Amino acid sequence: MTNLEYARMILNDTDSSNQIFTDSELQQLISQNSEIKVVPAAPKNLAKTIWQIPYRKLDSTYEAVVYDEYQTEYDATTDYDAGTATLTSAPDYPVFMECKIVHWNDVKADGLEMIATDIRRWNSYSDTGLSEQFDKASLLAYSRSIRSARGVEL
């Protein structure tokens, strides 16, 4: 599943004849809620050939790099959906993965805010029967509640 397909799925925008967001709008939401980060990985098997990071559904357009604490790179096959790296040889030191992480809750929150504040999108959302359960204020409150707490607002 591509990033755009996943974004459409979490925003309930899967009707191809009546799409609420264009591909470029969704791509912009994904890129503004993404960051390149180095995260520690934990071994997932006893042979230490499969390593897990605490993120799922990574951005597959960015080539992930796996290395140890001495910055020795390892040949690895990355599963971007599961957030795992399968190494060809077991390392002797802790492993880190440099990857592009998408904060999907923030993508969803931004998308819901765009729906609530744009009458065209709100009407399209209403046509599919998804807005009948809550009003705009509830939708905005829900988007605030799912947003990740990062950084400091000044």
Regions found by a protein language model. Give the residues of each.
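Conserved short "hinge" loops at termini or chain/domain junctions
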Residues: 1-104, 114, 145-154
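Charged low-complexity stretches with an acidic bias
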Residues: 72, 121-152
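Amphipathic protein-protein interaction modules
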Residues: 102-134
